[in-house]
Amino acid sequence: MKRIEVWADLVCSWAHIGKRRLEQAEFDEDVEIVWRPYLIDPMAPATAGTFDAHRVVALALDRGGPALQDALVERIMHAYFVDGSDIGDRATLAALAAEAGLDGMAEALDAGEGTDEVRDQLLRGKAIGVTTSPTFVVGESAIAGAQSPEVLADLVRHAVPARELPDEVTRLRHAESLLDLRDPLGALRIMEPLLAEHGDDPSVRLLAARAYFGSAQLGRARETLESLLERTPGDHYARFLLGRTLERANRPVEALPHLRMAAAMSSEADYTDALRRVESRVS
């Protein structure tokens, strides 16, 4: 059975249309549909946003599986698009969940349940390149927008299977993607389990140092990099990043020897540019 992940905002009209087209698609094999969160306006206030609705949808998957989750998504979308209900209201969400067969949501929402899951999934979506509601993902293949039933069937038919990777590897890759997207705080959040369980691993520590540097946590970046370099003094990138950290902390004299060593070990342009810049400040 193939899994179709639908990344969508529940108040997106194209997501509503996409759901109908997904239901009309004729697949060659059994599929399961899993809904993932996407926020068209992540800065929307709680009274107008869909974050709580995404929490309930995530809890439905956790407690009742894809079928219950899909039934709840149907009720939420009907309530919003047909009945004009406020799906940012927790009492409304709890009632809709109960109609779908999921009880106890008022208490769950008040207790904060589902918050971490939704935040983690939002970061995962960002890391894998989701930028549109809806986006349909099957294995390593994806397509954005409310596509026709035929296109959705072709997506499932020709999807590249996802590689089975350890969770640690997946988190590292997602953290790297978030750093490339200039979201260092998101990268650190994704890395929390890695730092807790594999905090001594050099690759984990170096990635964390990059995230600390990117989020201007310069003291933590320096501490992490100095510890790394005690173990692996020949790591030219860690040496370069320590030099850059000290430069940003307005310590050019301390930065200079690290940048000189990094430039001596590797001729990368970033290294030589940083070295020239700091040398001009020190001279």
Model-derived regions: residue spans:
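Short coil turns that delineate tetratricopeptide repeat
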Residues: 199, 233, 266-267
